[in-house]
Amino acid sequence: MGIFPGIILIFLRVKFATAAVIVSGHQKSTTVSHEMSGLNWKPFVYGGLASIVAEFGTFPVDLTKTRLQVQGQSIDARFKEIKYRGMFHALFRICKEEGVLALYSGIAPALLRQASYGTIKIGIYQSLKRLFVERLEDETLLINMICGVVSGVISSTIANPTDVLKIRMQAQGSLFQGSMIGSFIDIYQQEGTRGLWRGVVPTAQRAAIVVGVELPVYDITKKHLILSGMMGDTILTHFVSSFTCGLAGALASNPVDVVRTRMMNQRAIVGHVDLYKGTVDGILKMWKHEGFFALYKGFWPNWLRLGPWNIIFFITYEQLKRLQI
């Protein structure tokens, strides 16, 4: 759990630095002050709302990705059977055997996760960018990647308990029993705090990769399309930029995502040794026992989720910005 002190320190530094910039902005000009104060809360609110909308719209695809990733574990008898041949086969079989509502198993903790993770992720990312540069035109890929990595690690670590519950509900489907709050309590009583933050390291690593790739790729693609004169600041530009960043994020994150999913699905049992002790250990074991392409299990549903998810998210986010709610 040594990751927390460093993350908390980074978070506090960001908060103090943001406060310092806001004070400085007040001293320089009223315009800059207004802009910085807006960045204090609007990206947080817009990011959270857009994340919830995108999560609900793409959740069935995310569930099939989880089922595909946890199956075929030769060293875990519970998930040794290969039940699903692909994304569409998984969708039809889940509907047939468990009912249509099973496609939304784990939706409650998923929405709760996005309300926290999505809110913090976008808010910190946008605030950090303004600490480095004041104008959008001055942003660079490197600056945006650094901001994305930091915001991804902080937000995913805070939201990890909701992710653990979502993964378990998705993997076990109709076999999972209990309410969301009751399940949180049950995990805490049986596995302790470590159970709620099980898989936090690969989760933070995946978030660092996904956010560190997706948000900068979106910003740079959008900036290039607009400044080059190819497109204006329109929904089509937002669509192309979000589609591109979704593909880039899926390619970069899938191996870590598979390991993260399996680690979170592990239960703490007396006398039982965890199959995967960490990200590197998980990748090496999967490669050894299941082959290299096991690291890209669930890639198509992962991409087909990240693509539409990012499209829905960024279009919703951009429209909320224009509405100036």
From Swiss-Prot:
What the entry lists under InterPro entries is as follows: Mit_carrier, Mito_Metabolite_Transporter, Mitochondrial_sb/sol_carrier, Mt_carrier_dom_sf
What is the regulatory mechanism acting on its activity?
Increased activity at pH lower than 8.0. sulfate/sulfate exchange activity is inhibited strongly by pyridoxal 5'-phosphate, bathophenanthroline and the organic mercurials mersalyl, p-chloromercuribenzoate and HgCl2. Proton conductance is activated by cardiolipin and long-chain free fatty acids and inhibited by purine nucleotides ATP and ADP. Chloride ion transporter activity is inhibited by long-chain free fatty acids.
Provide GO CC annotations from the record: mitochondrial inner membrane; mitochondrion; plasma membrane
Keywords linked to the UniProt accession? Membrane, Mitochondrion, Mitochondrion inner membrane, Repeat, Transmembrane, Transmembrane helix, Transport
Transmembrane regions: 38-54, 112-128, 141-161, 199-215, 240-256, 298-315
Q: What reaction(s) does this enzyme catalyze?
A: sulfite(in) + sulfate(out) = sulfite(out) + sulfate(in); thiosulfate(in) + sulfate(out) = thiosulfate(out) + sulfate(in); sulfate(out) + phosphate(in) = sulfate(in) + phosphate(out); oxalate(in) + sulfate(out) = oxalate(out) + sulfate(in)
Task: State where it is primarily located.
Answer: mitochondrion
Q: In which tissues is it expressed?
A: Mainly expressed in brain. Some expression in testis and pituitary.
**Which is one Pfam family of this protein?**
Mito_carr
Solcar repeats: which residues? 42-131, 139-224, 233-323
Membrane topology is:
Multi-pass membrane protein
| Keyword Transmembrane helix belongs to the record | yes
Record has Cell cycle as a keyword: no
Q: Where in the cell is it found?
A: Mitochondrion inner membrane
Report a single Gene Ontology molecular function. Answer: transmembrane transporter activity
Family the UniProt entry places it in: Belongs to the mitochondrial carrier (TC 2.A.29) family.
Q: What does this protein do?
A: Transports inorganic anions (sulfate, sulfite, thiosulfate and phosphate) and, to a lesser extent, a variety of dicarboxylates (e.g. malonate, malate and citramalate) and, even more so, aspartate and glutamate and tricarboxylates. May catalyze the export of sulfite and thiosulfate (the hydrogen sulfide degradation products) from the mitochondria, thereby modulating the level of the hydrogen sulfide. Also can mediate a very low unidirectional transport of anions including sulfate, phosphate, (S)-malate, citrate, L-aspartate and L-glutamate.
Quaternary structure and interacting proteins, as annotated = Homotetramer.
- Protein name as it appears in the record: Brain mitochondrial carrier protein 1
Source species of the chain: Homo sapiens (Human)
Q: Which gene encodes it?
A: SLC25A14
